Amino acid sequence: LSGTNGQVSNTLVIGAGDSGKAIVCTYTNTRKSTTFRLAKAWSANSTAGNIASLAATTGLINNTAVLNSTASTATNGTLVTVFAGETATLPAETMSPGTLANYTTTVSCDAGTLTGTNGQSAGNTLAITAAATATSPITCTYTNTPKTATLQLAKAWGANSSASDSASIGATTGGTNNTTLFSTAGGTAAN
């Protein structure tokens, strides 16, 4: 036999001594496989102590287990074996304690074909392609990023304000980025 790859042509030479014998060539198909896991990442300014939960995947022969991650520690789930041609339905992230509405959650995978990137939505899927089995492990990472807003303090003076009036507004506290103290004289708006 000139080779053992059943996906290319091979030549079998039958010798004179094999004449009349039953010769059997067996082709064995082995499904391509790799390992797969879910992972959790937290962006800067995530609230320490928030706990995100990812339920098990569905749709695979070997589904992932539940993954819990406490901010702000990145966490990798347990590896499972997956096969080319499978499609994993990825779980929607939940949170307790903490408020999921305070975060955006994106999901990204380093191999395969991902459909959907909102980690808070159900129905995102990952198709395990034959090419994806070259990556080991395939990792789908859910990343939480705190939502932000702009806080601006302002002082406006009414129509009957005196030019001799003044006001000072102190700095805010307790935020990641706090405002600073500012003062203004009567009749002059400030922010």
What are these model-predicted stretches?
Residues 10-12, 23-25, 75-80, 124-126, ...:
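Short strand-edge motifs at loop-to-beta-strand transitions and within beta-strands
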Residues 32, 38-51, 147, 153-166:
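Structural motif
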Residues 14-34, 40, 128-149, 155:
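Conserved "repeat-terminator" motif of extracellular CCP/Sushi domains
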Residues 1-8, 85-121:
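Surface-exposed interfaces of beta-sheet-rich extracellular modules
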